[in-house]
From Swiss-Prot, chains A, B, C, D:
Domain notes: Has three domains with a flexible linker between the domains II and III and assumes an 'L' shape. Domain III is highly mobile and contacts RuvB.
Organism: Desulforudis audaxviator (strain MP104C)
Functional note: The RuvA-RuvB-RuvC complex processes Holliday junction (HJ) DNA during genetic recombination and DNA repair, while the RuvA-RuvB complex plays an important role in the rescue of blocked DNA replication forks via replication fork reversal (RFR). RuvA specifically binds to HJ cruciform DNA, conferring on it an open structure. The RuvB hexamer acts as an ATP-dependent pump, pulling dsDNA into and through the RuvAB complex. HJ branch migration allows RuvC to scan DNA until it finds its consensus sequence, where it cleaves and resolves the cruciform DNA.
UniProt-listed SMART domains: HhH1
Residue segments, region Flexible linker: 144-152
Annotated region described as Domain I, given as residue ranges: 1-64
Primary gene name: ruvA
Name of the protein: Holliday junction branch migration complex subunit RuvA
Region feature Domain II, mapped onto this chain: 65-143
A GO biological process held by the record: DNA repair
Length: 202, 202, 202, 202
C-alpha cells in the first residue's frame, strides 16, 4: 500500500533509518549498505518501501531502487524466507549479483548471507529461476503501458524488455543491456538471461 | 476508512498506479482500463478508494467513480469473489454494462472476465439481483440527505431515485435516466430496472 | 489511536460522512442525527473519532463531543454490543438521555433503538450502572490533571467532578450541573446521579 | 513503524495525550509523569512513539527519550509484560533507576510498580540482565554508524559505548558516563555496569 516515502532523514541506525514526512517519523528497516550510503541527517531522501503487515506488527522496509524492492518481493515469495532475510540478501549481494548468481545457479554465494543455509539457498535458486521464467510468460501477455516504450523491435526483444522492467530495471537500463548483447538472435528467455549476466557483471 | 486519494500521479503500471499525497506514495490497484485513461505522471488525480484489510496485507483499490466502487463493493459481497476478481469485472465490463447484464440475466458476458467461470457468474447474477431488490427496500426507508434532492415526485420515483443513488449513480445521472423513461407508471423496482437498461445501453 | 479529524467536509450520506485531511478522504460512520447537523459540504468540520480495528476491516466512527464518544466506548464494552449498535444508541437517544435512562433503570427507552432487544437493554443497564460506580472509584484515585480544575470543594464533589469528566462531560458542564444541585450533602455517587438527572432532563 | 510524532499538544489526560499532526489528532498513551511534564496545550511537542498492533486495536505509546522507549521495548520482550505494564515501569522508576535496579538485582523496587508482583519482578530481572549481556555481544559486532563516534579508544570502551547507545543513551551521555569512571581497566561488561550505576544514581 505504501510505495515510497519522501522526507527529511532524521536518524540513521545500523539497520534502520527514520524519515520524517509531515511531522510523523517513519522507522524504515534498510540494509546496512543502504544506511551507509545515505546523506547526512537533515537532507531529503526518497525510499521505495514495502509495508509488512502481520497480526502483531506493521513494519516498513526500504530500498534505493525498484530493482532492489522487486528482488526483495520475489525473495519474500520463497517459502521460509521472511522480510529480514530477504533484506539481508538484497543488501549483501545487491540485485544484479543476485540475478547473475541465479543464472549461474551459484548457491554458494547465497550461503554467504547470514540466515541462508544450503537448503534455503537451493530453494531460492529453484523458485527464483521458476519465477524468472513465469515473469516472462506473464509479462509477455501485457506489454508495459508506462514510459511509452517503443514496441518496434521484434517480439522476443519486447518480451525480454517487459520481463526486465517487471524485475524492477528501468526501461533505459533494460534497453541498454539488450542493445549491448553481441547475439540478439535469441528467444525472450535467452535475451533476458544474457542481459542479466551483463548487468550482473557491472 | 480511506474514501479517496487526491494527489500527484507518480507511476502507472499495467494494474496499479502510485499517487503521492503529502510525501507518501500510495500504491493503488486499478483496472487496466482506468490506468490507461489517467493523465501523464505529474498531474493531479482523484481516485475513489477501497482499503482492503487482511491479516497479512493492507491493499488499496481505486476507481474513477462512486458508481464503479459501489458495484465493486457489491461484487465483494458475493461468496468467493475477492477484490482482484471484482476489480476485473468492473474494469472489463464497466458498471453500466454490468447492471444491464444483471437485468438481462446475461451470465455469458460475465464469463468473459478472467477468473469468472459459469458457477461464479450464476452466483453473481443471483446475489446481485437480490441485492438490487434489497437495495431498494433499504433505501426507500431513508431517503438520501445529500444534494437536497427534491422529494416532490411520486413515492415510487423517489424510491427509484434513492436506489440508483445508493448504487453509486450521481443524483443528476439518476434523475436524467428516470426522466427519459417512456413509461413512468411503474413501481420503484420497475423504474430502477428501466433506468439501468437505459444507462446500460449508453 | 486516532482521536479526532479536522478537515473539509466532502460528502454526507445517511450514516457516514467523508472528511478530507491533507488530500486523503476519510469515511467516518456517524449517527444520522450528526450527519443531519453538519454544515454544508466544503466547510471545515471537527469530529471526535474512534478507530475500530478488526482482522478484515479498519472503520472510523465519528462523534460531535467527547461525551458521546465516551458513552459509545462504554457501550462497546457491553457484551454483544458492536460499534454500529453503540452508534445507534448514542445517535438515537443522545448521551444525556442515555445516562438519565440508566439512572431511572428505564430499559424501555433502550429498546426503541433498532438492534436493541429486551435482553440487550437489560445487559446495557446492568453493565453501565456497574461501570458508572467503577468510573467513580477509578477516577477518585487520580483527580484530572487537565484544565486546572480547582480542587478546593469537598472530596465528594471533586470525586463527582472527576467522574463526570471521565464520562466525557467538559469540566464546565460538570461544575455547572453540580452547582445547580439543591442538595449537595451527598456522597460522590449521589452527586453524580443527581447531576446526570439534571443534565439528562435538559 | 511510527518512530515519533511532532505536532500541537491538544489535550492532556492522566495517562494519555492527544497530539495534532496535519489535521489528525493522535491519542498517545504516556506515563502520568510524562503527561505532567508536558507544556500547556497549544504548544508543539515531540514524542518518541511505539505503535502497538493487535488483532483488534492499534495503540500508540509515547516517550520523552529513546532511552525510555528502548527500556520499554526490552520490557515488552519479557514474557507476560504488556505495553501498559512496561509503560508503568518506565514511568514510575525512570530508565536510569531501572538499569541501576537491574544491576543491583533489586527486585523489591520493581514490585513498587502496580501490576508487577514478585514473580514478574524476578522474570524482568533475569531477562533484562540476560539482554544486557546479549546487547553487548550483538552490539560489539556492529559498531554504530551514527554520530561518527570516534573509534579511537580501546576495544572494550568502544563496545561499552555501543552497548550504552543501543540501550537508548545518546552518544554524549554514554561517553560522559564512561569518562567519569574511576577505573577503566574493565572489560566491556564491567564498563557498561559501572556506567549504568553512575547514571542510575543521577
Amino acid at each position: 500500500m505504501i510505495d515510497f516515502l519522501k522526507g527529511r532523514l532524521v536518524s540513521v541506525y545500523p539497520e534502520a533509518v527514520v524519515v520524517e514526512v509531515g511531522g510523523i517519523g517513519y522507522r524504515v528497516q534498510v540494509p546496512p549498505s543502504l544506511a551507509a550510503s545515505l546523506p547526512e541527517p537533515g537532507e531529503t531522501v526518497f525510499l521505495y518501501t514495502y509495508l509488512s503487515v502481520k497480526e502483531t506488527a506493521l513494519e516498513m522496509f526500504g530500498f534505493s531502487s525498484e530493482l532492489d524492492r522487486t528482488a526483495f518481493l520475489l525473495l519474500l515469495g520463497v517459502a521460509g524466507i521472511g522480510p529480514r532475510t530477504a533484506l539481508a540478501v538484497v543488501g549483501r549481494l545487491g540485485t544484479r549479483r543476485l540475478w547473475a548468481a541465479i543464472l549461474r545457479e551459484d548457491t554458494g554465494i547465497l550461503t554467504t548471507v547470514p540466515g541462508i543455509g544450503v537448503k534455503s539457498a537451493r530453494r531460492i535458486m529453484v523458485e527464483l529461476r521458476d519465477r524468472l521464467e513465469k515473469q516472462q510468460v506473464a509479462v509477455s501477455a501485457e506489454l508495459p503501458a508506462s514510459d511509452g516504450v517503443p514496441v518496434l523491435a521484434g517480439r522476443a526483444e519486447n518480451e525480454a524488455l517487459a520481463a526486465l522492467i517487471s524485475l524492477g530495471y528501468t526501461p533505459r537500463e533494460a534497453r541498454e543491456a539488450l542493445n549491448r548483447l553481441p547475439d540478439r538472435k535469441l528467444d525472450a528467455a535467452g535475451l533476458v538471461h544474457a542481459a542479466l549476466r551483463i548487468m550482473g557483471s557491472q
